[in-house]
UniProtKB/Swiss-Prot annotation:
This is Turripeptide Gsp9.2. Keywords: Disulfide bond, Gamma-carboxyglutamic acid, Hydroxylation, Secreted, Signal, Toxin. Disulfide bonds join 53-68, 58-72, 64-79. Belongs to the Pg turripeptide superfamily. The modification 4-hydroxyproline is found at residues 49-50. Expressed by the venom duct. The keyword Mitochondrion does not apply. The modification 4-carboxyglutamate is found at residue 56. One of its GO terms (cellular component) is extracellular region. InterPro entries: Toxin_Pg. It comes from the Eukaryota. It comes from Gemmula speciosa (Splendid gem-turris).
Length: 82
């Protein structure tokens, strides 16, 4: 009877350890996929446009992207931020 109890306890312990290891590897895999996606977007310039204002030539505020909060700087002829 004691041997059966010990075997049962050991099996439950081993299964719980395995489940914990699976959970950690799943989190690691998701983090790796997210990091790979970010790096791929940075390298190939795919996905969302960059969230900053580029020095674009402009003649009016309509020529500038939404990230250029100051609009067109008419003195320099380029888009600018505040």
């Amino acid at each position: 009877m004691m041997a059966k109890l010990m075997i049962t306890v050991m099996m439950v312990l081993l299964l719980s350890l395995q489940q914990g290891a699976d959970g950690r590897s799943e989190r690691w895999r998701k983090n790796q996929m997210a990091a790979s996606s970010i790096m791929r977007n940075l390298i190939t310039a795919r996905g969302d446009p960059p969230r900053f204002c580029r020095d674009e030539l402009c003649s009016g505020d309509g020529d500038c992207s939404v990230w250029c909060t100051a609009g067109c700087n008419h003195d320099m002829g380029k888009c600018d931020t505040l």
